[in-house]
Each structure stands twice: as C-alpha cells, then as structure tokens.
C-alpha cells in the first residue's frame, strides 16, 4: 500500500475482494456500500422468480428457431403447451437473509400475493422495521426448507454460510422447489445441487454467478452477475462511497 492511503471504499456490499487483514495491519479503514444497489438486485431476483416459473426463455427460443415458418401463429398454438408454467401468487417464498436486499425482496413478494417466510438470526433493528408485518419470521432454516416452494438467498459469504445449501438442506426441501442465488455462489454446494436437479428434487436453480460448474448444471438459469448492473445502482454506490470517504477524512 502507498503510505498516503488512508481508506478504501468498496462500491458494493461484499468486501471479499479486499485484503482486510492487511488493511487492518496498516491502519487503513475499509468501507462498503450496503443497500445502495438493493433495488437493482431486488428487481433481478423478481425477474428470476418469473423466469423460473414460466418458461419464457424457452418460448422465446422457440420463436427464434421457427421464424421462417409462414404459419408460425398457428404452430405456436400447438407448441406453447411445452412452455406452460405456474403463477407465483399464493406460493410460499423463503427469504434467507433479511438485510437491505432480502427485506425488499420479501416486501415485494408480499405485494405480489406470495406467502413469505423470512430467516435471519442476525437481523438488525433497522432491517426489522423495514420488513412487512406480513412476513412470517422463522428462527430455523429447516422451516424455510420444509415449507417453501421458492427459496432465495441473501446472506454474506462467511464460514458459517459457505455450502449452507447442501445435501442435508436439499433433502428437507419440497419436491420441485426453486432455488434462487443472487448473493454468492459458494453458499450452494453445487455437487449436491447437481444431484438434486438431476432427480427433480429441485425444479429450477437461478443464479447470478457463472462458473464452470453452474453453466453445466441441468435445469439452471445462469445470469452473468447482473444484479447491480444498472446505472442507478452504480450511481448510488458511487455516491455512498464518496460520502463515506469524505466523512472519514473530515470527521475521522
């Protein structure tokens, strides 16, 4: 590090790409920007919910593949049966992690008519105030696994959460469950998940993390880390980071 470096601001919530121990040894303060990109990620999670429930992508690809068919309108009426899905209204959604993003996902899912369960043993007072009173708070991940049709992950990548979705957790889940991971890829044991996808235990896996394993999983929608890839999210993160640095330099 340069001797003049006093602080580092990370434009995002995760700080796993910053050498925290080295910074601490040098007295360099590290900031992140939690919540600045929450709306952008929330909207992509909702898109994932819809993509997993309705085979929209399959239908679009069918149209592209049959664009030379002069009778495509008639053909589509027969073909569309293969892309039938289900509605999310009335389904049970389990939100694991009720920070800024998880709370927004939970509240919006309530507004869409879903029955929402929330699990977060470390929920803050501010996060609790943001959460709809209609969210059913549970103290056990097991309850989420056993009760929910959809499970979405919104926890940080730490030792206690690495591989939290493993064979034991998957075995407790409903047949045909949908799992969404827009937090960190290492939260899911992808070897165990591969078996659950193959057997049909997990109907669909939606992830915002492309890696050599995820892109080869069956019944999986892989998105190239687009959660915060909006102009609004980038602006919000930059503004928060600048404000944090200025406040530290001016006030300590």
What are these regions (language model features)?
Residues 1-32, 146, 166, 189:
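An N-terminal-biased, well-structured beta-alpha scaffold segment characteristic
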Residues 117, 121-213, 229:
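Rossmann-like adenosine-cofactor binding region
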Residues 98-99:
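Glycine-rich Rossmann-fold phosphate-binding loop(s) that bind the pyrophosphate
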Residues 215, 227-252:
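NAD(P)-dependent dehydrogenase/reductase Rossmann-like domain
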Residues 34-92:
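Phosphate-binding beta-alpha-beta segment of Rossmann-like dinucleotide-binding domains, i.e.
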């Amino acid at each position: 590090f340069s001797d003049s470096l006093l602080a580092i601001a990370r434009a995002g919530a995760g700080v796993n790409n910053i050498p925290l121990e080295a910074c601490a040894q040098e007295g360099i303060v590290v900031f992140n920007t939690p919540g600045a990109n929450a709306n952008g990620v929330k909207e992509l999670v909702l898109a994932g919910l819809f993509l997993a429930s309705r085979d929209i992508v399959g239908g679009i690809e069918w149209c592209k593949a049959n664009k030379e068919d002069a009778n495509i309108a008639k053909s589509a009426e027969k073909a569309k049966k293969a892309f039938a899905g289900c509605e999310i209204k009335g389904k049970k959604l389990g939100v694991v992690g009720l920070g800024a993003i998880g709370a927004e996902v939970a509240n919006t899912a309530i507004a869409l008519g879903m029955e929402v369960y929330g699990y977060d043993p470390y929920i803050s007072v501010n996060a609790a105030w943001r959460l709809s009173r209609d969210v059913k708070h549970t103290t056990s991940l097991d309850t989420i696994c056993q009760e929910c049709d959809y499970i979405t992950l919104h926890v940080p990548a730490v030792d206690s959460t690495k591989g939290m979705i493993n064979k034991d957790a998957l075995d407790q889940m409903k047949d045909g469950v949908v799992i969404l991971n827009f937090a960190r890829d290492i939260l899911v044991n992808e070897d165990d998940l591969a078996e659950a996808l193959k057997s049909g235990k997990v109907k669909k896996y939606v992830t915002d993390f492309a890696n050599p394993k995820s892109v080869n999983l069956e019944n999986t929608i892989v998105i190239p880390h687009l959660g915060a890839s909006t102009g609004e999210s980038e602006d919000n993160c930059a503004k928060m980071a600048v404000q944090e640095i200025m406040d530290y330099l001016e006030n300590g």
